Curated annotation (Swiss-Prot):
Pfam families, A to Z: p450
Protein family (similarity comment): Belongs to the cytochrome P450 family.
UniProt membrane topology term: Single-pass membrane protein
Keyword Transmembrane: yes
Enzyme Commission number, as recorded: 1.14.19.72
Source organism: Podophyllum peltatum (American mandrake)
Cited function: Cytochrome P450 involved in the biosynthesis of etoposide, a chemotherapeutic compound of the topoisomerase inhibitor family. Catalyzes the conversion of matairesinol to pluviatolide.
Organism lineage: Eukaryota, Viridiplantae, Streptophyta, Embryophyta, Tracheophyta
Name of protein: Pluviatolide synthase
Cofactor: heme
Length: 489
């Protein structure tokens, strides 16, 4: 009897597996009629998934592109994904045919925290998206509001420096700078959302924790997009459960603050409420801004510090550039001085080139039947833009894997090509709406941290690990610990 039950169970498993295989083959047959760009050889059922392990995905795809071309097709199981990696193909997708590629390929699991794809970065282009983006970029992220934020952000930098000094004093001179910078970014985002006068450290600390926790589950979305039947896997079900748990945390955290706020018209909440959006959409849009903005400038500034710990000459050049502008004045580097610091701007650009915060951008999807460099691309095709590969293209950049800020001080041959090959915020219709405030936050933080402290390794002879970890953004796989010494004790 037990043997019969076992055989029946095995037979059922085989039947299910066979059914999945048949469905896969039928769907694959329809895809095979399309002439996709070339790519690595595939295996049945899994496509190219076996080739995407090891390094982080953007690095793996860059290596594959060197073999199979700057426009290649990667099969995530039965799903074709076109990956573009050079200047011409990236520019066509992002700029020349921006509207053709402006749809989004959002994972189902992401809809849990995005009000069913009603946030800026998850919604397709169209009237709703245009209204939402215009409200963000003309209001809280507009030039007037950013200018109004500058004195507040400068005072916040004084707080960051003071808290770093206290942290170092309590820990033998060693700190984790990312923690301090993230808290500063969270405070900035909160002011953009709720208005300049918003000041609520318990709320900001709680939001920081929620974002940190949710970042750990970024890979679940990729799993779902790779396998249509991933929803039946235990790991995916656990991920969905975690997303729902965090959705409730977000609601419980944001809802009372929204209810008690009287936001100014130039705040994000003020705009969202003026459109009479549902509470679910308002909370989703607010959380998205934290998710995308909280870590980006903080992580990029931390990468820059790590590069300068590894190359003390770069750090000294930057310090001298700062002193050239502000002289012997002790105190804060002001935002108005940043544009005069040419080497600072070079370090900022080189850091964003080496470690783009979103190395694969956010996956695009064709909104219509279109073409790419002469090859037909059907509507609904997922297209990934590998900004990491673009920023490390040896045909454009000299010694692309070496940190050399000087490359941005003296133009290389082919000026226009170099400019088109440097796209840390993307380009075209879907360019990052927070580009200007992000650059300001990064530059202001870096200038002040190098002006206030000399940065060295936490342990003598142990340089920072520069390995990437791709979550929703690129972070340091090993969080930076550094020893700081005040320059003006």
């Amino acid at each position: 009897m037990e043997m019969e039950t076992s055989v029946l169970g095995l037979s059922s498993t085989l039947i299910i597996a066979l059914a999945i295989t048949v469905i896969f083959l039928l769907k694959a047959k329809s895809s095979s009629a399309i002439k996709w760009p070339p790519g690595p050889k595939t295996l049945p059922i899994i496509g190219n998934l076996h080739q995407l392990g090891g390094d982080e995905l953007h690095i793996v795809l860059a290596k594959l592109a060197r073999v199979h071309g700057a426009i290649m097709t990667i099969w995530m199981a039965k799903k074709p994904v076109i990956v573009v990696s050079d200047v011409n193909s990236v520019w066509e997708v992002l700029v020349s045919k921006s509207s053709d590629y402006a749809a989004r390929d959002a994972a189902e699991i992401s809809k849990i925290v995005s009000a069913s794809s009603h946030s800026i970065n998850t919604s397709d282009s169209g009237p709703y998206w245009q209204t939402l983006r215009r409200g963000l970029t003309h209001g809280p992220l507009g030039p007037l509001n950013i200018s109004a934020q500058i004195p507040i952000q400068q005072r916040d930098m004084q707080r960051v420096i003071r808290e770093m000094q206290q942290d170092a004093a309590a820990n033998g001179g060693v700190i984790k700078p990312l923690d301090h910078l993230k808290r500063s970014s969270t405070r900035l985002v909160s002011r953009l959302i709720f208005g300049d006068t918003f000041d609520n450290d318990p709320y900001n600390d709680s939001m920081h924790e929620v974002v940190q926790d949710l970042n750990r589950f970024g890979g679940i979305a990729l799993l779902e997009q790779a396998f249509s039947f991933a929803k039946y896997l235990p790991s995916y079900k656990r991920g969905v459960k975690e997303f729902h748990i965090h959705k409730r945390k977000i609601d419980d955290l944001v809802r009372p603050v929204v209810a008690s706020s009287n936001p100014p018209s130039n705040s994000y909440l003020g705009f969202l409420q003026s459109q009479n959006y549902s509470e679910e959409i308002i909370i989703a849009c607010i959380f998205e801004l934290y998710l995308l903005a909280m870590d980006s400038s903080a992580s990029t500034a931390t990468w820059a510090l790590a590069f300068m710990i590894r190359d003390q000459q770069v750090q000294e050049k930057l310090y001298q550039d700062i002193k050239r502008v502000i002289g012997d004045e002790v105190g804060l580097v002001k935002a108005e001085d940043l544009s005069k610091m040419h080497y600072l701007q070079a370090v900022v650009k080189e850091t964003m080139r080496m470690k783009p915060i979103a190395p694969l951008a956010i996956p695009h999807k064709t909104a219509i039947d279109t073409s790419l460099m002469g090859t037909k691309v059907p509507k609904g095709t997922c297209v990934m833009v590998n900004l990491y590969a673009l920023h490390h293209d040896e045909s454009v950049w000299a010694k692309p894997y070496t940190f050399m800020p000087e490359r941005f001080l003296q133009r290389e041959d082919g000026k226009s090509v170099t400019e088109q090959a440097f796209l840390p915020f993307g380009a075209g219709m879907r360019i990052c709406g927070g580009m200007e405030v992000g650059k300001l936050q990064f530059s202001l933080a870096l200038a002040n941290l190098v002006n206030a402290f000399k940065w060295t390794s936490a342990a003598e002879g142990k340089l920072p690990d520069m390995s990437d970890e791709l979550q929703f953004i690129t972070v340091m796989k090993t969080p930076l610990e550094a020893r700081i010494v005040p320059r003006n004790p």
